[in-house]
Amino acid sequence: MTIDAHQHFWRFDPVRDAWITEEMNIIRRDFLPADLAPLLKAAGIDGCVAVQADQSEAETQFLLECAQGNDFVKAVVGWVDLRSPDVAERLAYWAEQPLVKGFRHIVQGEPDDKFLLREDFNNGIAALKKHGLTYDILVYPHQLPAVEQFVEKHPEQPLVIDHLAKPYIKKKEIGDWTKQIRRIARMPHVHCKLSGMVTEADLQNWKEADFRPYLDTVLEAFGPGRLMYGSDWPVCLLAADYTRQKAIVDNFIGSLSDTEKSRIMGGNAAAFYNIS
């Protein structure tokens, strides 16, 4: 099974979705399963993982509703307040929904660089394992020192870094990011998504060669057994259509074995998110 391990749906709301600025006009509209289905079919992708873009439990419910009648939506990564004293109760509720496979918090937007080390947040993370739920780590490179400490606290919790931790590709900054990624990747329970790269590059003038040093780094650090392809659609449309962004990964993994390619393009995501 081939899987796009990272995409979003939304009904655009200019207030709730204030992060989608006027400069992002191409994505200031609704994006729903009917929009994605033909793109997946054309790309030879069997299914996808729908990831939260809004921090509310209503978002988790919305993604489940998107999955109804759309069998290609194989998993939902929702949102729940992991800092809440009621987190155990809320996780028990969502764990009853078979498609809810994990959760994500938009840590990249937190002003505290050490947000991931908060005691209340870590209590919530510790409660995920009971229900077999995963956690997606969304951060910027300057937050990676906290990520290293965070992943060490939860050695049995399945964790995945979204978008290679958003390296500053446009600026060609790689040194500090590389050191941190290598340190974090030493921990076998941490995975990484090959996603979200085009929007960290020069949106209008990127070249595939721009991504190679970063892709080489994560392949060496995580190996083909802990990487998973994700489109970050529709956010990717700011810099590339579905076909162009997928081609970056396809071309990069072209020299790998068929087994390794199969794992990156779906097998790893299926195992991580418990997709059957």
Predicted regions and their residues:
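Divalent metal-dependent hydrolysis catalytic cores, especially in the metallo-beta-lactamase
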Residues: 21-29, 34-55, 73-81, 101-105, ...
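Alpha-helical scaffolding within the catalytic cores
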Residues: 32-36, 58-59, 86-89, 144-145, ...
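Mid-to-C-terminal alpha-helical segments outside catalytic/metal-binding sites
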Residues: 1-3, 14, 21, 25-47, ...
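Active-site gating/metal-coordination segments in enzymes
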Residues: 57-143, 149-152, 193-197, 204-205
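Catalytic pocket-lining loop regions of alpha/beta-barrel enzymes
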Residues: 115-228
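Conserved, mostly hydrophobic/aromatic
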Residues: 6, 48, 63, 76, ...
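Short, electropositive alpha-helical surface patch
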Residues: 58-73, 155, 160-161, 212-220, ...
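Histidine-centered catalytic micro-motifs
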Residues: 2-12, 161-164
